[in-house]
């Protein structure tokens, strides 16, 4: 068998000691000096064709309403609003004007 300790369980392995992890070759290497290269900064982030920035990215803000759902073909706009149900007003005007 090898010199390595016997692994008894499937748990997380013990943390290695710094003496074991450091190799003698790593100590001999000299640190290389890194030259800082200036990155090219783009002048503008706008698209070239002049299009508006895309919407619908990420989570919507808290006050935003949900987008209106597209009705199936031939179904109209669904249930009318509550304030649009007053239809009796037209009938009462005809009766009042005949007097």
Curated annotation (Swiss-Prot):
Ranges annotated as biased composition (Acidic residues): 90-99
Segments of the chain annotated as binding DNA: 7-19, 54-66, 74-86
Top-level taxon: Eukaryota
Keywords: Chromosome, DNA-binding, Nucleus, Phosphoprotein, Repeat, Transcription, Transcription regulation
Family matches, as SMART domains: AT_hook (SM00384)
Basic and acidic residues: compositionally biased ranges: 16-46
Residues found modified as Phosphoserine: 4, 23, 73
GO molecular function, one term: minor groove of adenine-thymine-rich DNA binding
Stretches assigned to coiled coil: none
Disordered: region residues: 1-99
Posttranslational modification: Phosphorylated in a cell-cycle dependent manner; substantially reduced in cells that have finished proliferating and are differentiated. Phosphorylation at Ser-4 and Ser-23 results in a 10-fold weakening of DNA-binding activity and altered the mode of protein-DNA interaction.
Gene Ontology cellular component terms for the protein in this record: chromosome; nucleolus; transcription regulator complex
Major site of localization recorded for this protein: nucleus
Subcellular location as annotated: Nucleus, Nucleolus; Chromosome
Physiological role: Binds preferentially to the minor groove of A+T rich regions in double-stranded DNA via the second and third DBA-binding domains. It is suggested that these proteins could function in nucleosome phasing and in the 3'-end processing of mRNA transcripts. They are also involved in the transcription regulation of genes containing, or in close proximity to A+T-rich regions.
Family: Belongs to the HMGA family.
Protein name per Swiss-Prot or TrEMBL: High mobility group protein I
Higher taxonomy: Eukaryota, Metazoa, Ecdysozoa, Arthropoda, Hexapoda
